[in-house]
C-alpha cells in the first residue's frame, strides 16, 4: 500500500542521500480511502479548480513531478536529477524513483521533516516526523553523509488510490534547524 507521507519522506531520503519520495505507507492511504468512499463523484468538483500553488519553485531536471520549493532560500540538498517511472504514477503499477544529488552537510539524529498532503483543497496530512526514523523505511540510516549520492527505489502503488489531484510538500531540517530541503509535487491519479 502507499502513503503520501512516505512519498514525501522517500523523496527527501532519496534526495537527501542523493535525494521527496517514494515508498508509501498504509495509514494515510486508508484514511483517504475512508474519506472518499465514492471518489469518482469528487473529480468534477476539482477539475476546474486549482490546487494551492507554492511560489518560488524550481523544476528538478529529469522526468518527475517533483520540484524544489522555497528555491531562493539556502538549502543543504542540491538535486541534479529525479526520475519517476511511470510519470505520472499509475494506481496498481510499480513506481521506480531514481534521484541524484549532493548534500552539503552530514545529516545527524534529530533531523525532522514537516509533511503536508492535500487532496485538492482538503488537507489529509500535516505532521512532523523524525527524519532518521523514517528513512530506515527506505533502506537508509543516519548519519547521512555529505557528498554526491544516487538512490533508486521501487514502490508498489495500490489500485485503491482515489483518483484526483494530490499536492505533497515536505520541508526537512537538521537538528539545529538548518534547511535541508523543500520538495513539492503535484500528482494526478486519473479515473480508471
From Swiss-Prot:
Pfam families noted in UniProt: E1_DerP2_DerF2
GO biological process, one term: sterol transport
InterPro entries noted in UniProt: Ig_E-set, ML_dom, ML_PG-PI_TP, NPC2-like
Keyword Signal listed: yes
GO terms assigned for molecular function: phosphatidylcholine binding; phosphatidylinositol binding; phosphatidylserine binding; sterol binding
Propeptide: 22-56
Keywords: Lipid transport, Signal, Transport
SMART domains (alphabetical): ML (SM00737)
Signal peptide as annotated in the record: 1-21
GO CC annotations, alphabetized: fungal-type vacuole lumen
Family: Belongs to the NPC2 family.
Assembly: Monomer.
Function: Catalyzes the intermembrane transfer of phosphatidylglycerol and phosphatidylinositol.
Protein name as annotated: Phosphatidylglycerol/phosphatidylinositol transfer protein
Amino acid at each position: 500500500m502507499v502513503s503520501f507521507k512516505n512519498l514525501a519522506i522517500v523523496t527527501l531520503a532519496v534526495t537527501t542521500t542523493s535525494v521527496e519520495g517514494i515508498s508509501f505507507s498504509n495509514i494515510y492511504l486508508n484514511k483517504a480511502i475512508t474519506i472518499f468512499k465514492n471518489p469518482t463523484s469528487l473529480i468534477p468538483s476539482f477539475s476546474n479548480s486549482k490546487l494551492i500553488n507554492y511560489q518560488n519553485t524550481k523544476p528538478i531536471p529529469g522526468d518527475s513531478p517533483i520540484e524544489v520549493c522555497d528555491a531562493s532560500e539556502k538549502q543543504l540538498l542540491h538535486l541534479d536529477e529525479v526520475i519517476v517511472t511511470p510519470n505520472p504514477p499509475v494506481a496498481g503499477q510499480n513506481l521506480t524513483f531514481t534521484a541524484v544529488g549532493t548534500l552539503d552537510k552530514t545529516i545527524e539524529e534529530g533531523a525532522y521533516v514537516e509533511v503536508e498532503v492535500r487532496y485538492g483543497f482538503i488537507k489529509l496530512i500535516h505532521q512532523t516526523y523524525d527524519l532518521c526514523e523514517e528513512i530506515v523505511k527506505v533502506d537508509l540510516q543516519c548519519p547521512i553523509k555529505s557528498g554526491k549520492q544516487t538512490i533508486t527505489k521501487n514502490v508498489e502503488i495500490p489500485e485503491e488510490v482515489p483518483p484526483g489531484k494530490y499536492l505533497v510538500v515536505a520541508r526537512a531540517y537538521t537538528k539545529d534547524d538548518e534547511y535541508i530541503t523543500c520538495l513539492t509535487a503535484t500528482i494526478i491519479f486519473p479515473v480508471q
